[in-house]
């Protein structure tokens, strides 16, 4: 039942992709995900494995970039079908897969159906997951994440064929090319392993051995992708000169968990809400249910795993503050973190953990002695909401988004009130009515997440990427044999961003001005490019 309802929710939220053949068009999807997928598609159709990209940065490694997903088997979908809708459906399929996997993982850990349903919905539709639809590699890794955790945990318990499945799933995730998401996956695996090892007796060594086998075999399975990547990383400018840390959460970034438009830049410049302090994700909003249920998951719970998980979430939130949180700088002094330029990505750990903690909270909602804990939790979340509202009016905000944030505040208070009332009712109602109220919490959370920031993943007609552009054709055909185009950065930046309603214009303009990787769409050789890793020789040029 949950699988069918989740599928309907994903289809309903993205009906223009499913029924009208549209594709995504915001930011990195248009200048990174789509062009790279097109390069892969054209190479494979020509019977070639794209080891090298001749069109960008005067020649650049393609397969070794890792996030090009050259060796990720599901990318064959984009080769067999029209790329625009196929790539969008690829992303939506992984979004759905991740939510379904989180449902089964939460059900395994909590043995509670409504709690597992809430976890699945939160994981599927939270702000980071919806934003990740513009990064095919990230959404693919997130979609496999709960399945890897579930398979590896089952594998170290039972061994046998399940262990082989864990190896295959883990190796498959390694081919997605999303390093941070893969690291967070295995942080969860090791947390769960440590928790079980504490309680295990003679089986402890066997569990550790089986987990080690999965790690080793998965790495061996993906070695054809990992070895070129690490070679490129070792010779890239990121390690050669030290990565520049950008996009981290400021000290008041916690307010965005309760007021998604807090400290934001408006629609007109970026086509979507962007936080002034970080540009990686448009939102990291989780809804109100996880925070209202958090106290129930942590207090008077004999199982200490939720508390360990919550402690790791706190550390992740501090890491997400980057240099301003001090902890990131201290760890960086011991173990260089240049490979992660965006500390805000540590919020992904909270995005994974909070749905599971919410599921534990639902399980313990009706247990005796928890009434006081629930009311204290509601009061604390209410105080944080009030503080966020006060800061919204008294802390200096970017002028572009202040009016929008003030307009959104009453709507947020209504959603908070509706969620809090539903949680209280679920605590007091008995019998069949209680189950209905619990699924009401799931429905409220899903609706809240889907509407908390409209147009998180806007779509455009697939033809926006396919229309023949005379200017691009001239550059591609009437050039000097060894020549390359080199647009100014100012011209590029002026074309990449703009209001949502202008996306059908922005994408052709982006192609005309060769913004980032748009040159791959029209096969125009370019001096520059938009990649995670760059060779030092290109940087010097």
Where are these regions (language model features)?
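N-terminal membrane topogenic signal
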Residues: 1-3, 372-373
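Membrane-interface helix-loop junctions at the exits of transmembrane helices
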Residues: 11-19, 44, 77-81, 85, ...
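Extracytoplasmic catalytic/substrate-binding loops of multi-pass membrane glycan-assembly enzymes
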Residues: 18-36, 62-73, 239, 463-468
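Periplasmic/ER-lumenal interhelical loops and adjacent helix-loop junctions
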Residues: 27, 31-50, 214-297, 332, ...
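Transmembrane alpha-helices of multi-pass, membrane-embedded glycan-processing enzymes
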Residues: 41, 78-81, 90-101, 141-144, ...
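Transmembrane-helix signature of polytopic, membrane-embedded enzymes
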Residues: 100-124, 157-163, 372-375
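Contiguous transmembrane helix-bundle modules in multi-pass membrane proteins
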Residues: 137-143, 151, 155-167, 171, ...
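Soluble catalytic regions of membrane-associated enzymes that act on cell-envelope
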Residues: 405-407, 436-541
């Amino acid at each position: 039942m949950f699988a069918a309802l989740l599928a309907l929710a994903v289809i309903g939220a993205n009906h223009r992709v499913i029924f009208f053949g549209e594709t995504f068009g915001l930011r990195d999807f248009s200048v990174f995900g789509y062009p790279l997928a097109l390069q892969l598609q054209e190479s494979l159709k020509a019977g070639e494995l794209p080891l090298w990209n001749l069109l960008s940065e005067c020649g650049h490694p393609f397969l070794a970039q890792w996030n090009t997903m050259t060796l990720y088997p599901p990318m064959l979908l984009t080769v067999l079908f029209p790329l625009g809708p196929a790539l969008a459906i690829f992303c939506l399929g992984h979004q759905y897969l991740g939510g379904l996997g989180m449902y089964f993982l939460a059900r395994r850990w909590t043995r509670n159906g409504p709690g597992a349903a809430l976890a699945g919905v939160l994981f599927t539709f939270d702000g980071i997951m919806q934003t990740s639809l513009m990064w095919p590699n990230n959404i693919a890794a997130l979609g496999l994440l709960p399945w890897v955790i579930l398979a590896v945990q089952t594998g170290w318990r039972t061994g046998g064929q399940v262990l082989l499945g864990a190896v295959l799933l883990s190796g498959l995730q390694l081919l997605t090319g999303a390093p941070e998401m893969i690291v967070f996956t295995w942080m969860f695996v090791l947390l769960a392993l440590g928790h079980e090892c504490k309680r295990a007796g003679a089986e402890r060594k066997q569990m550790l051995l089986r987990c080690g086998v999965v790690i080793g075999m998965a790495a061996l399975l993906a070695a054809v992708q990992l070895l070129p990547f690490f070679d490129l990383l070792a010779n890239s400018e990121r390690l050669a000169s030290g990565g520049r840390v950008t996009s981290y959460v400021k000290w008041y970034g916690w307010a965005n968990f309760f007021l998604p438009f807090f400290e934001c830049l408006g629609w007109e410049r970026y086509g979507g809400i962007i936080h002034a302090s970080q540009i990686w994700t448009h939102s990291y909003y989780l809804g109100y249910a996880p925070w209202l249920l958090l106290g129930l998951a942590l207090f008077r719970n004999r199982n200490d795993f939720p508390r360990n998980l919550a402690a790791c979430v706190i550390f992740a939130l501090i890491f997400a503050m980057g240099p301003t949180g001090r902890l990131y700088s201290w760890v960086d002094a011991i173990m260089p973190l240049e490979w992660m330029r965006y500390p805000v990505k540590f919020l992904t750990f909270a995005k994974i953990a909070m749905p599971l903690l919410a599921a534990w909270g639902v399980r313990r909602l009706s247990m005796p002695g928890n009434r006081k804990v629930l009311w204290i939790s509601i009061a604390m979340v209410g105080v944080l909401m009030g503080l966020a509202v006060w800061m919204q009016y008294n802390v200096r905000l970017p002028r572009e988004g202040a009016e929008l944030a003030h307009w959104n505040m009453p709507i947020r208070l209504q959603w908070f009130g509706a969620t809090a009332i539903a949680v209280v009712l679920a605590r007091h109602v008995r019998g069949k009515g209680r189950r209905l109220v619990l699924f009401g919490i799931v429905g409220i959370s899903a609706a809240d997440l889907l509407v908390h920031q409209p147009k998180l993943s806007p779509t455009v007609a697939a033809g926006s990427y396919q229309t023949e552009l005379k200017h691009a054709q001239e550059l591609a055909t009437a050039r000097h044999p060894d020549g390359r185009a080199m647009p100014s950065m100012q011209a590029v930046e002026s074309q990449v961003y703009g209001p949502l309603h202008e996306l059908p214009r922005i994408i052709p303009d982006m192609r005309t001005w060769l913004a980032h990787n748009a040159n791959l769409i029209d096969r125009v050789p370019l001096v520059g490019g938009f990649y995670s890793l760059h060779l030092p020789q290109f940087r010097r040029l």
